[in-house]
């Protein structure tokens, strides 16, 4: 069954309130997350309960989480990944206890998502996100990071937090030996580790390609 939902970036970051979302015909709930919790840390049950209560007070439901971000150690396959996987499992447990059973995530290295233009103008005057591989191939990662952040018009973008800039070069170094095959193997390792918890609570993991 399809449920109509809208992405909501939280009361601190979204200019569209829950009350306005509620007025959209057919919309039953929102897709949201806890933006201030860094990847790798456990989501406390109390924080999930507070977010759920805030959404439900407007007459909507949390229909999914996007995202519970995955720590780089899990993607790289570092020895300390076991602790971060354990934290992720605890987060899934807490979400399951509150009946939140759809979790989006990605397994992309370094950047959670990449666009080369956040406001590409179309012939009708509207703007869209755009990606050009030639731009990515020709630019220094740190310069690209700064350009993307500066074009965000003051909005905080998940996966592009300023604190990541300080370690972006270190991340590229950490990922240098991670081949496509190794990245996939690490994904399989992660999924096998969380599978029992997902089955216990009926959680559907939706990977962002």
Per-segment meaning from a language model:
Residues 2-8, 28-32, 62-66, 103-105, ...:
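Hydrophobic faces of well-ordered beta-strands that scaffold small-molecule active sites
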Residues 6-16, 34-47, 82, 110-113:
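Acidic-and-aromatic substrate-binding clefts and catalytic sites of carbohydrate-active enzymes
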Residues 24-45, 66-77:
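N-terminal substrate-binding region of glycoside hydrolase catalytic domains
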Residues 4, 62-69, 161, 165-168:
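Membrane-targeting and insertion segments and their boundary/processing signals
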Residues 18-26, 43-63, 93-97, 195-202:
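Acidic (Asp/Glu)-rich catalytic clusters
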């Amino acid at each position: 069954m399809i449920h109509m939902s809208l992405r909501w970036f939280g009361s601190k970051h979204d200019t569209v309130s829950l009350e306005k979302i509620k007025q959209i015909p057919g919309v039953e709930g929102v897709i949201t997350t806890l933006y201030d919790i860094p990847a790798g840390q456990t989501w406390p049950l109390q924080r999930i309960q507070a977010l759920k209560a805030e959404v439900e007070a407007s007459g909507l439901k949390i229909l999914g989480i996007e995202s519970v971000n995955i720590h780089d150690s899990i993607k790289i396959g570092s020895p300390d990944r076991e602790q971060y996987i354990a934290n992720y499992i605890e987060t899934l447990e807490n979400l399951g206890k509150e009946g939140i059973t759809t979790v989006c995530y990605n397994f992309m290295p370094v950047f959670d998502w990449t666009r080369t233009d956040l406001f590409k103008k179309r012939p009708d005057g509207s703007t869209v996100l755009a990606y050009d591989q030639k731009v990515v191939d020709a630019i220094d990662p740190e310069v690209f990071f700064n350009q993307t952040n500066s074009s965000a018009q003051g909005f905080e973008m998940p996966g592009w937090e300023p604190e990541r800039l300080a370690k972006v070069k270190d991340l590229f170094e950490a990922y240098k030996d991670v081949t496509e095959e190794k990245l996939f193997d690490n994904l399989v390792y992660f999924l096998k580790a969380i599978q029992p918890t997902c089955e216990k609570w009926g959680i559907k993991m939706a990977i962002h390609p």
